Every structure is written in C-alpha cells, then in structure tokens.
C-alpha cells in the first residue's frame, strides 16, 4: 500500500470489521479465574517473524491518541512500517475522545481480538499506553491467541497485556514499539533484529548483546540467566493479587516507570519485596524512571532503587535504555537472557520469532 492510499484510507479501508469475537460477559469471569498450567515448564511458542508484505494491526487496547498525535506520530509510524515493507492496518477506535479510554471496554477488546483472529494480520503493535488494558483482560480470548500466535508489541500500560499473554498462552511477546511512540534509529536497531530477519538478511538467530559501560550502572555485581519478564512498575504492582499476577520465579525482571516520586517507587518495590517477587528473581534490569518528582524530599529515585534492591544479593544493573524514553531497547517476554552485571552486558540468548 503506498503512502497516499494509506493516508486516504485510515478511517475506512484500513479498519477491520465489527464482527463479534468476544466471549459473553457471563463467561468473562470464569475465563479469568480458570486454572492454567505453569507454562514456564515448557519452551515458549514463538510468533512468526515479520516478512515483507505482512499486514500489521494497530489497535488501542488502552487509551486513544489525540488527533494531532494521530496525524503526526501515528501516520509517521505507518510510513516507517511501509518503508521497511510492511502494511499498517489501523483499528477504528484509536483517536481519543472525551474519555481516558479509547472506546468502551467491549469495543477495545473486540478490535484487538479481530486482529488476533484475522488470518490476513501477521502482527499487532499497540498504538499507545495510558490506561485501560486491565479492564479488558477478562474479555481476551487466550485460547484464540494460542491458536493464532502473532507478534504482539507494546509497553507502559501494555505491560499487563504482554506478560499475561506470555503467562496464559506460553507465547513470546514484546515489550517494544508502539505506534504513537518514537520509532527512531536506535529503537529499530534493537527491534528489527529480533523480529524481522528477512529485512536484516539473517538466516538464523545470533545472540544479541547490549553493552554501554559508560551509561549502565551496577547496583549489585554478578551474573544470572533467566527468562525475561517485566515492564512498568506501576502496572506490575497493580496486577498483584489478581489472576494476572506475574510469576517472577527465576526470571530476569526488568522495571521502568514515569512520573513517580521516590517514595512511591519505594512503596511499590517494598510491596513486591513483601510478596516475595523480588527475592524470586535471578536478576534485575532497571530501565528509565523518567519525569521523577523529587521536589519534596532529598532522597532520589536512584538512592531508593539502590536501597531496595542491593540487599537482594542478585545481579542488578540500572540506567538501561527502556521505558518512557525516545531510544528504547525491545525486551522479548519469555525469552532466555543473561545479565552480566560485572561487565555491564545484557544478552538475549534465544530466537524470539519463528524463522
């Protein structure tokens, strides 16, 4: 699809139909509370790799985008996808109205599930975070996702989505790009090698290692291996005590947040510690804690992170390029990784997509 055709068809031809794909409201709670096996016992399912000509669905499971961001950021992202041979397909309910939600829960869940079930859609990249994913988790048909495994990417509020899909479906997902966020050269550099081997002329996966000794900080030295889990700290703690609670046992956990004061970060980390979540990890990678509001107290976010995490005696590094920042590293949820805090290295050891 050329750019002109795409821009002219954003509101109509690029939108999927509205056929019902949801479980009934009465069954939603039963789906939420259903027993599930410990998927961590089995190798994860890999979604198909991106390929030239593949259609990429762009839904809004949480908040919508402002009209000006749609015109500038989302269309810019769509153009970038076209530039690497992909075809963007935007859901109908993505532009924000008067609510903090892009659309009613049933509509957001339905549009997401339409992308899952549509065989013409090869991947799903969420449009933005904000709030709302938790509200639709009981409406997600996880069995349909298992039957139609696809690349699913998002961060921030979508921490709840990508981690839950991995847990319920044993499917690798991606804490990665969104359509209304920057898709700069750095972000593409650490996303495309994981998901688009054809574009990178890769015939097989090779270990992907990030190391920037000048920027990365070491809170606790050491080396650890584990499967990658994590995302936004606020969302992870919000899921605790629900059926979508994240199991951190043996994981390399990564955390980031935006706009939180040091004492609030302390409270969330303490909650995780009291629940045994931090002690269960093999290692921890700290992303960016941006727009931190430390005007009332002298204690900084960095001091808080050190005081809460150093006593764990597991490898912990900080200042990693992920979170609510322009340049973002993509974390494949469920893939085996190694954290080498001694040498300030983080390595993805397994393929994240099916070649």
Give residue spans per PLM region.
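Short, acidic/small-residue loops that bind anionic groups at enzyme active sites
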Residues: 142-164, 172-178, 312
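N-terminal export signals
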Residues: 5-30
């Amino acid at each position: 699809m050329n750019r002109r055709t795409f821009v002219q068809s954003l509101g109509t031809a690029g939108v999927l139909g509205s056929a019902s794909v949801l479980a009934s409201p009465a069954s939603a709670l039963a789906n939420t509370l259903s027993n599930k096996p410990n998927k961590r016992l089995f190798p994860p399912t890999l979604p198909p790799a991106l390929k030239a000509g593949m259609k990429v669905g762009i839904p809004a499971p949480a908040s919508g985008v402002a009209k000006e961001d749609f015109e500038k950021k989302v269309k810019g992202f769509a153009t970038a996808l076209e530039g690497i041979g992909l075809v963007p397909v935007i859901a109908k309910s993505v532009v924000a109205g008067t609510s903090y939600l892009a659309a009613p829960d049933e509509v957001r869940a339905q549009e997401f599930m339409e992308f899952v079930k549509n065989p013409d859609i090869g991947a799903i990249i969420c449009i933005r975070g904000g709030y709302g994913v938790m509200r639709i988790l009981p409406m997600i048909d996880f069995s349909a996702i298992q039957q139609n495994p696809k690349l699913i990417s998002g961060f921030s509020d979508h921490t709840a989505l990508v981690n839950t899909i991995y847990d319920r479906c044993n499917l690798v997902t991606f804490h990665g790009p969104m359509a209304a966020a920057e898709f700069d050269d750095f972000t593409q550099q650490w996303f495309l090698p994981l998901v688009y081997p054809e574009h990178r002329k890769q015939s097989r996966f090779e270990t992907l290692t990030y190391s920037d000794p000048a920027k990365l900080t070491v809170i606790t030295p050491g080396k650890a291996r584990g499967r990658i889990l994590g995302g936004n700290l606020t969302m992870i703690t919000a899921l605790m005590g629900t059926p979508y609670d994240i199991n951190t046992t043996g994981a390399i956990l990564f955390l980031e947040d935006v706009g939180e004061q040091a004492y609030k970060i302390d409270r969330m980390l303490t909650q995780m510690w009291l629940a045994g979540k931090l002690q269960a990890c093999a290692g921890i990678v700290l992303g960016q804690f941006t727009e931190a509001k430390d005007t009332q107290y002298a204690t900084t976010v960095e001091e808080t992170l050190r005081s809460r995490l150093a006593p764990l005696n597991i490898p912990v590094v900080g200042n990693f390029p992920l979170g609510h920042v322009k340049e973002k590293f993509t974390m494949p949820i469920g893939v085996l990784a190694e954290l080498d805090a001694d040498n300030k290295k983080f390595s993805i050891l397994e393929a994240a997509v099916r070649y």
